[in-house]
Amino acid sequence: MSVGFIEFLVQDFSMFRDFEKPENQLSQAIIGASIEVHKHLGPGLLEKTYEACLVHELLGRNICFVRQVPIPVTYKGQTLDCGFRADLIVENKVLVEVKAVAAINDIHRAQALTYLKLTDLRLCLLLNFNAVLMRDGTVRVVLGL
């Protein structure tokens, strides 16, 4: 299942430039974009608002992504749509989940790990725009560490 999922994303990105940035460099660029959004909007809005503004910021920085990506589950050879959706997958390397919650907690980390396992990606950024400072609302979840 996950190989087909990644192949689908690669096909989507085929019209864009080469993707040779390492995950660490991409995550820094994504975090920089989220800080810019947070600087202009501050905390207190809905997740979808922050997601839309983050998308705008990433586009302005020529960072390629897909938005609201369905993440299927394979069970006994059947691919099932269980309602999982990644907010963003950036350059087929970094999964981004936008949050506007009091605090990132274990359920958010578990969701990130589940999405990473289902997509064969290694890095998820949980971006909580409800934090007073964006750096305090940013959590890196890495699969396999």
Language-model segment annotations:
Residues 1-25:
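Intrinsic disorder/low-complexity segments
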Residues 42, 65, 86-104, 115:
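Conserved catalytic cores of phosphodiester-cleaving nucleases, focusing on short active-site segments
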